[in-house]
Amino acid sequence: MSPLKIQGPIRIRSMQTGITKWKEGSFEIVEKENKVSLVVHYNTGGIPRIFQLSHNIKNVVLRPSGAKQSRLMLTLQDNSFLSIDKVPSKDAEEMRLFLDAVHQNRLNAVAMKPSQGSGSFGAILGSRTSQKETHRQLSYSDNQVSSKRGSLETKDDIPFRKVLGNPGRASIKTAAGSGITATRTIPSLTSTSTPLRSGLLENRTEKRKRMLSSGSELNEDYPKENDSSSNNKAMTDPSRKYLTSSREKQLSLKQSEENRTSGLLPLQSSSFYGSRAASKDYSPSSTNLDRTNISSQTPSAKRSLGFLPQPAPLSVKKLRCNQDYTGWNKPRLPLSSHQQQLQGFSNLGNTCYMNAILQSLFSLQSFANDLLKQGIPWKKIPLNALISRRFAHLLVKKDICNSETKKDLLKKVKNAISATAERFSGYMQNDAHEFLSQCLDQLKEDMEKLNKTWKTEPVPGEENSPDVTATRVYTCPVITNLEFEVQHSIICKACGEIIPKREQFNDLSIDLPRRKKPLPPRSIQDSLDLFFRAEELEYSCEKCGGKCALVRHKFNRLPRILILHLKRYSFNVALSLNNKIGQQVIIPRYLTLSSHCTENTKPPFNLGWSAQMAISRPLKASQMVNSCITSPSTPSKNFTFKSKSSLALSLDSDSEDELKRSVALSQRLCEISSSEQQQEDLEKDSKSCKLEPDKSELENSGFDAMSEEELLAAVLEISKREASPSPSHEDDDKPTSSPDTGFAEDDIQEMPENPDPMETEKPKTITEPDPASFTEITKDCDENKENKTPEGSQGEVDWLQQYDMEREREEQELQQALAQSLQEQEAWEQKEDDDLKRATELSLQEFNNSFLDSLGSDEDSGNEDVLDMEYTEAEAEELKRNAETGNLPHSYRLISVVSHIGSTSSSGHYISDVYDIKKQAWFTYNDLEVSKIQEASVQSDRDRSGYIFFYMHKEIFDELLETEKNSQALSMEVGKTTRQAS
C-alpha cells in the first residue's frame, strides 16, 4: 500500500530558498481537482510548502540510510530537489512506487489512502479529453462534489456496490474471466456520510449512465451497497487492488471514446445532489437538510436526469457563469494559510522580549509609514545599519514571507543591535524596556548618519529656489512619533528666580504608586501624574544664595505616541535579586496630559509633516527632526558646506586618514592668513576663475550672502579645485584638491562607493596646471612667504607616492582581515547554534518554574514617598469619564501593551497585545502564536503583568482610523464596480 504521509528529516533545494538545513517534518500527498501535490510540513510549525507533482516529476531516487531505513530523493522539472531521510524502508518504497506512478502518468491506477478507510482502488477517473468536453455541462454538479471533498477524507468503512449496467447504453464490462467487478463509491451529501477521497470519484460519464438505470435495479443493489464485508475482503490484497484499478482504467478510457462518438445528453442545472439554491450553502445544517429532502425522493426521481429535456437558455447561461467563476477550480488553501497575516515571530532562544517589542513598534502605523514611505536610499546605507535590510526589511515582509525567512530577518535585527549593545548578543533573557531603548537610540543614530553622509536628489520644484537648500533631509520616525520634550523649571523659593532646562525623552519610566489598602487600585493615570508632580530639592541659587528650590515639570512638545514604562521591579539587597511587584494597576483606555501642559506646549507633528517641509526655517537642536548640519547663512545650494568634524565622521575608513591631514592643513592655513590677505586671495582667485565662465558663475552666485569666514572657506574650496601643485602656500591643501575629497556633499556621497578615482584623478590635476592661476598664486605665495617653491612641489609628489603605498598596504590588510573574519564568523555560527539549543531548554525550564508565580507578589510598591495623588471630587470624576471617552484635551488612546509573565526580570516570558488599525481589532502576539482578544480583556488581564504601555494621541488615532475606513470603503466600491462591469 502506498502511504500518503511519511516523516523524517527534510532538506529542500530550490531557486527561491537555496539549500535549507535538515529539519524534522513530513511529506504528505494531497490530490485536489485531479492534481497531485506534495505538502511539506515542519514540526516547528509555520506555513506548509506545497509542490505540484502532476507532470512535474523529473526523477525519484531511493537509497538506503541505516538499518531498515531509506532516504527518498525527489527532483522536479524546475530542478528543485526534495529529500527526506531516515524513513522506514517499507514506507519509503511504497512512496517511491506512488511517485513513479505519478511520474509515468499512472495516477488513476494508484490508491490514494488505503490506510485511512478508503478500502479500494475502485474509483475510476475519466480521461482528460472527456472531462474537458463535458465540463461546461457538468460544472455545477462537479462544484458541489468538490466543495465537500475537504471534509470527507478521514472516515472509515466505505461501502461499495457494483456498477450498474444498462443494455440501452454502452455499459461498463470487466475483462473476461477476471472475476473482478468494477466498483465505485456512493457520492456523499453530508460531512457525516460515507467519505470520498478527493480526486478519486468515478468518471462522470459512468455516473450519468448509472443514473439512467431502472428503479428495480437500484433497489436490488442497495443491500449490496451496505454490505461492505465482502468488498473489503476482496480488496485486502494490494496486488489485486492494483490490477483491478489498471483494468478499470482501461475500461474507463474505452468507455469515454464510445461516449464521444455517441454523444451525451446535456445535464440539467438541477441534479440529484440537490437544488441550485441549496447547493450554495455548505454549512453542516444546510447539508443535512439537503440529505433529508433528497432521501425522501424515490430512487427513480434521483436517476431520471437522462429523460429530461434540453436545458433552457437561462439555465445554460447560469451554468456558464458558474463555470467562468475560477474560484471553484482553485485548490483550497490549508487552514494555516488563511492566518498568514496573523503569524508572529519565532523565538530564537529567550528572545520573547525582542518579539514583543517589535510587534508593538510595527503596529504603530505612523511610525511604519515614516520609516518606509519617504524614499530612503536603502542601497546606500551600510549593511550593518539597523534600518538597512534589517528593521525595515522585517517590517515590510513580516506579513508576506514564510516563517523561515522571517526567522532569518529576526536574526539580522538581533545581530545589528548586538553589534552595538553586546548584552543582547547571547541567548539569555533580557529586559524588554532595555531592548526598546537600545532599538530606538540605534534607529535615531542611523538616521542621523544617513542625513550627514548622503546627499540625495533635489526636492522637486526647489531646484531654482535661492532661499531654500536643495538637500533633502530624511525624517527620523523615532523623533517624529516617539520623542517628546519636557521642560524642568527650577524655581528658587527665596527669590523666585526661574531656571528652565529642557530634556528630550523617547519614553517615561513611571513609579508604581504606593497602594493604600482601603483605597481602590491606582491607575496608569495616577502614576503619570505622580511623575509630573512638583518636587523640592536642595539647590544653591546664584542670585540670592538660597538653598531650597522647587522643580516643576511640563511638556514642551508632545509626541504622537507616548510610551510609558511601569517600574515593576524592586531590588532585594539581602538576596541580590530583582523581584517583580505584581501590584494591580488599572489600565485606562485614555490618558490625559492636560494638567501637565502649558499654553506654549507644542502639539504632536501632524501626519503630513516631514523634515523637508521644515528645512527652510532654522530650528534649535532640540527641535531638529534630523541633525543634518548645514550653514544657515549660505542659502545658495552651490555652497552648502558641512563642518569638518561632521564630514570626517561621514566618510569611510579608506579616505579618513587623507581627510584628517587635509583638514589639519586647512585649519593651519586659516589661522595664519589675515582677513586682508584673504580679501586679496578672493580677488585674484576670481580673476583666475574667469577662464571657466560656467563654474565662476555658479560659485559667485552665493558670495553676496556670505560672511567673511564663509568667504574664506569658499576661497579655499576654489583654490583647491582650480590651482595646480606649484610653489605656493596652498600646497599644503593640495592633497584634498581632487573632486573626491572636496567638501561638497556630492563628492562625499561618491567617496564610499568608489574610492579609486581619488588616485586616478590626482596625476591629471598635476599634469594640467592652469598657467594664469599658476602665475598669480606664485606671486601671492611670494608675498605671504609661507612656503618655498621647489620643496613644496617635490614634497607633494612624495606625499602622493607615500599615500599610494599606504593604500596598497591597507588593501592587503583588509583582505587578510576579511579572510579571518569569515573564519571567525563560521566558528561563531557554530557556537550560536549550540547556545541556541541550550538557551531554548533553559527558557522552557525557567518559564515552567515561574509560571506558578506569574501573577507576582501582591504587595505594594514600597515607595514611601509616593503615596497618592490628591484629586478633588470633581477632578476624580472628570478623569474617570475621560478614561473611557477621551474628551479632555491632549488625550491619548491605548494601542499596545507589553506584559511580562514571571517573578523576576531574568526569567519568565514577554507577550504583547496590539491594536491593529487596519483590522480594527486587538491581537495577542505570543511569539509565533497570534490570537484575537477583546480590549476589555486586555485591560483586565494585564493589570498585574503590564510592563510597557503605548498610547497614541487621540487626534492622530482618529485621523488614522478615518483614513483606513475611507480606504476600505473605496476598495469595496471599486471591487463592486469591477464585478458589475465584468
From Swiss-Prot:
Family: Belongs to the peptidase C19 family.
Protein name: Ubiquitin carboxyl-terminal hydrolase 37
Motif KEN box 1, residue numbers: 32-34
InterPro entries: Papain-like_cys_pep_sf, Peptidase_C19, Peptidase_C19_UCH, UIM_dom, USP37-like_PH, USP37-like_PH_sf, USP_CS, USP_dom
The EC number(s) this enzyme carries: 3.4.19.12
Motif D-box 3 per UniProt: ranges: 161-169
GO CC terms of this entry: chromosome; cytosol; nucleus
Polar residues compositional bias, start-end: 137-149, 282-301
Chain location of the short sequence motif D-box 2 per the record: 96-105
Post-translational modification comment from the UniProt entry: Polyubiquitinated via 'Lys-11'-linked ubiquitin by the APC(CDH1) complex during late mitosis, leading to its degradation. Able to mediate auto-deubiquitination.
EC class name: hydrolase
Species annotation: Sus scrofa
